């Protein structure tokens, strides 16, 4: 269900994202970050599936899923590309590791430094603080709040795009 929601909102967000990035409603030049998150979620699902398999050779499809997720992220021009998919996987695999914050911080730094054309993504590193402080418990979980957070992404991009087109 989570993947279906990501897919739905990736589709809904694409037109405003294209408008923001290219000034056109349709473009294959860039794809929004929800596609990256969707690919990352599918790779994480494959990793969970592989944990249930007793034989090493039975886990090969999960390894293939990592490669396919990376390639689709790169070829699909998703925000942050295949490296973003791997970053999602890093956060997933280290979620229960003691000292995870250090691994995630180093991973994010290396990602920002080596895998993005501009170093401006380094400014996103303070966003790790709320992630590190997350206690693992679900917060308020009614549908209005849940879909409000999902809707925020395409709505704010659309507003910024319209402002950029007509005000600035």
PLM segments and residue spans:
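Alpha-helical transmembrane segments and their immediate juxtamembrane cytosolic regions
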Residues: 1-168
């Amino acid at each position: 269900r989570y993947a279906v929601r990501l897919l739905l909102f990736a589709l809904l967000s694409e037109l405003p994202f294209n408008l923001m990035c290219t000034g056109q409603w349709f473009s294959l030049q860039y794809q929004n970050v929800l596609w990256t998150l969707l690919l990352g979620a599918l790779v994480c699902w494959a990793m969970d599936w592989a944990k249930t398999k007793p034989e090493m050779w039975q886990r090969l499809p999960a390894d293939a899923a990592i490669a396919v997720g990376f390639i689709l992220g790169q070829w699909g021009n998703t925000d942050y590309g295949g490296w973003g998919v791997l970053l999602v996987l890093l956060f997933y695999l280290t979620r229960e590791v003691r000292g995870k914050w250090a691994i995630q911080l180093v991973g994010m730094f290396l990602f920002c430094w080596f895998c993005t054309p501009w170093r401006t993504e380094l400014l996103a590193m303070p966003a790790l603080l709320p992630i590190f402080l997350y206690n693992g418990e679900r917060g308020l979980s009614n549908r209005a709040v849940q879909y409000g957070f999902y809707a925020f992404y395409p709505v704010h991009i659309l507003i910024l795009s319209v402002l950029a087109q007509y005000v600035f």
